[in-house]
Regions:
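Terminal alpha-helical segments
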Residues: 1-109
Length: 109
C-alpha cells in the first residue's frame, strides 16, 4: 500500500483516534474529572492535527500539479472521518462546560 491509499489510512487512523479521545473526554466530564477530560481533548487535538496535516498534504500535492487524487470511497471516508472528529470536538467541549456548571450548581445546593 502506498501513495493515496496510505495517506487515506493515516487520516482515518489519526482522526478516528482523535474522535475517540473526544468521546472519552465527555465520559470523564460526566464523572466530573475535568483534568482527565481536558487531557483527552489535548490528546485528541494532537491526533487531529496529524490527520489534518496528512489531508493538507494531499491538497497541496494536487494544487502543485502533482498526481491528482482519484476520488475514491477511501478518500471520501477519510474526509468524512476528519469532519466527524472536528464535530465531536465541538460537542465534547460543550459537554465539558455543561458538566462544570452541573458540578458548580451541585456544590451550591
Amino acid at each position: 500500500m502506498e501513495g493515496l491509499e496510505l495517506t487515506a489510512f493515516q487520516i482515518i487512523s489519526a482522526v478516528g483516534t482523535a474522535r475517540s479521545s473526544y468521546i472519552e473526554a465527555i465520559q470523564k466530564a460526566k464523572a466530573f474529572d475535568f483534568e482527565g477530560a481536558e487531557a483527552l481533548i489535548k490528546e485528541g487535538d494532537e491526533m487531529f492535527v496529524e490527520g489534518h496535516n496528512a489531508h493538507a498534504g494531499l491538497l497541496q500535492q494536487e494544487a502543485e500539479g502533482g498526481p491528482g487524487s482519484t476520488l475514491s470511497l477511501l478518500i471520501l471516508h477519510a474526509e468524512d472521518q476528519l469532519m466527524s472528529a472536528e464535530g465531536f470536538k465541538t460537542i465534547a467541549l460543550e459537554f465539558i462546560d455543561v458538566y462544570k456548571k452541573f458540578e458548580k450548581i451541585g456544590k451550591e445546593l
